[in-house]
Amino acid sequence: MTTPQISVQLYSVYGPSEADLDGTLGKLASIGFKNVEAFDFVRRVDALKASFDAYGLSSPTAHAILIEAGTATPDGLLDTPPADEVFAAAKALGVGTVIDPYVPPARWGDLASVEHSAKVLNEAAAKAAEYGLRVGYHNHDHEFTSTINGTTAYEVFAGLLDPSVVLELDLYWATAGGQDAPALLRRLGDRVVAVHVKDGPMRPGITAAHLPDDQVPAGRGDVPLVESIKAGSNISYAVVEFDKYAGDIFEGIADSYTFLADTLKG
């Protein structure tokens, strides 16, 4: 097992970062983060880079739409600039892996659609390589609730990807999609280089189409986070994330950081 570095997905602090990007990144650094996972970064490369330099932060992974141009994500926030623009911005920020965060549920219902998504991501991987980068995919729940000939659409998709394409498994959404996350990680093996660490109660009806508002700091919900991290063979980054959080988001992130730091040093 690789010992992952701790990171945090900046979507978790979307509101504060829109109001004060530099101050938000400073707070994350004060919690102890050395890594963040940027999103919606193309429009603000210079501001991000200045704050990264000021606080000793890096963004080894980042999110950008690559497969489904014009996609409206559940939060409705991500723009879809051209791939060359995405990869140039990523390289300027020091990103190594650009991860597509979302392909809509309608694209997972049949083999032809899944094949198309894999083809587009493979093409993006070839383009990314021109910039010295690689690409990956981040899941929600619907990739698992759709099946093709008895296999989840997600695993069909993974099997169609070029070996250079990596996976970032969102442990919360995989669990919400009915998966045994540790077993899934063992099946996927070295393809999974990052995980999203988020937690909450698992109950019927949880879906990314209606983001739940009862997520909790890591280790306080029903997601098998520790077992999942131990099951991964090649996880380089454990990325804290909240889709929504009812409390103080910085306190929630700090609690999740402490949980991960304690887990990983054990």
Feature map (PLM): residue ranges:
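N-terminal pre-domain/capping segments
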Residues: M1-L93, A261-G266
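Hydrophobic faces of well-ordered beta-strands that scaffold small-molecule active sites
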Residues: P4-L10, V36-A38, S59-A64, V98-D100, ...
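Acidic-and-aromatic substrate-binding clefts and catalytic sites of carbohydrate-active enzymes
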Residues: Y14-A19, N35-L48, L66-P81, P105-G109, ...
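Alpha-helix-loop-beta-strand connector modules within alpha/beta enzyme cores
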Residues: K49-E68, L121-A128, Y154-D162, L225-S228
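Acidic/histidine-rich catalytic cores of soluble enzymes
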Residues: E130-D222
